[in-house]
A protein has these predicted regions:
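Binuclear metal-dependent hydrolase catalytic cores centered on His/Asp/Glu-rich metal-binding motifs
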Residues: 96-133
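Short acidic/histidine-rich active-site segments
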Residues: 187-204
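Histidine/acidic-residue-rich catalytic or RNA/ligand-binding cores of hydrolases
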Residues: 25-29, 69, 95-100, 144-152, ...
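An N-terminally biased module of ancient metal coordination in phosphate/nucleic-acid-related enzymes
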Residues: 1-95, 200, 289-331
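A conserved mid-domain beta-alpha-beta active-site/ligand-binding segment of alpha/beta enzyme cores
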Residues: 210-278
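Divalent metal-coordination and catalytic microenvironments
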Residues: 18, 61, 81, 102, ...
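Histidine/acidic residue-rich metal-binding segments in metalloenzymes
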Residues: 117-130, 147-158, 173-188, 192
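Structural recognition of alpha->loop->beta junctions
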Residues: 150-172, 209-219
Length: 331
């Protein structure tokens, strides 16, 4: 299995900077049965992350900090936990969304970010003004490089100091492209996270900073003094995640009753039976859909490589693209 192996020097702390719980909400697939995007609980995620060697823990649910707040309600004095969120921000000029990870925020900041996420420029301006740690997750996810590729890259590169250079759900080729961007442009640093939607891959990717405690770790992260390591994604990781969600749906209905606890009995029977009957469809659909997705992404990867090659030879973006105001406020 492809791995980015690094030797962590003494005095460094590690954290998986991208992971989810059931507070990420509903998935966009098989909506009639209302499956969640993830079935991991905040406490289970924390416990397993610590068991797998993470010194610090965060949760980055989609557009929600409810999982973080639920954990802190039960563990108010946890010295090794900080609030995170993966915010879906609209970039209207490219007719796409990007996922922006934000860290060490409070409830008021979450509400402000939620209010601004419909406008990329306003959201980034708020994050900079308030000195909030933020990173661009999986840079090329959902954006076709043939559609204003240079312009999109220019906007993203000028907007972020931190880029997710290792995502555990993405193959080595795509991760390496972001890593090369981090090398091409001054002032850019990388973070890593498993992007786990089940507990299977939790902690398989990590960000390390030289620090003795959470406060120092976040300061180093803000300054871009990071190391990244872990396992690259593969087709079978995504398939395992999909099947994990399928099985955990049944587990919650039959035994745990933690996620779909408010469903009436008739709805549990209807959705559970429908979910079971759809197993062949789900299995073949997940297998086929993920295979097609991988083929498309491999084609796009070629286009990304062409963009990066042009950048490295000076044919594309100005390699000095850095926002001086941003650098001066975060380094």
């Amino acid at each position: 299995m492809p791995t980015r192996k690094i030797s962590i020097p003494p005095g460094y702390l590690k954290a998986d900077m991208h992971c989810h719980t059931y507070h990420s909400g509903l998935t966009g697939h098989m909506e009639a049965f209302e499956p969640m995007d993830c079935y991991s609980s905040p406490q289970a995620l924390y416990d397993l992350a610590k068991k797998r060697g993470m010194d610090l823990v965060t949760i980055t649910d989609h557009d929600s900090i409810d999982g973080c707040l639920a954990f802190l309600e039960k563990n108010p004095d946890a010295p090794d936990f900080f609030i995170g969120e993966e915010v879906t921000v609209q970039v209207s000029e490219f007719k796409t969304n990007v996922h922006v990870a934000v860290y060490d925020i409070d409830e008021k900041q979450h509400r402000e970010i939620t209010h601004l996420k419909g406008n990329f420029d306003d959201a980034i301006a708020y994050l900079r003004t308030n000195n909030i740690i933020h990173a661009l997750n999986h840079l090329f996810h959902g954006f076709h490089p043939a559609k204003q590729g240079y312009a999109f890259l220019e906007k993203m590169i000028s907007s972020f100091q931190l880029l997710e250079g290792l995502n555990g759900a993405i193959n080595r080729g795509h991760n390496s492209i972001t890593q090369r961007l981090g090398e091409l442009f001054p002032g850019k640093s990388l973070i890593a996270g498993s992007d786990s939607h089940t507990l299977l891959r939790l902690g398989t990717c990590f960000t390390a900073c030289k620090a003795a405690n959470k406060t120092q770790f976040l300061q180093q992260l803000q300054s871009g003094n990071t190391l990244i390591g872990g396992k690259y994604g593969h087709f079978h990781h995504l398939f395992n995640d999909a099947m994990g969600v399928y099985l955990n749906y049944f587990r919650d209905l039959a035994f745990r009753r933690e996620v779909h606890v408010n469903w009436p009995f008739w709805k549990e029977i209807r959705n559970g039976a429908g979910w079971f009957v759809c197993l062949p469809v789900f299995f073949s659909g997940a297998l086929g859909g993920l295979f097609v997705q991988q083929c498309i992404e491999r084609f796009r990867q070629v286009k990304y490589e062409e963009l990066i090659a042009a950048l490295s030879t000076g044919e594309g973006l100005d390699q000095t693209i850095v926002d001086p105001e941003f650098v001066s406020t975060t380094r």
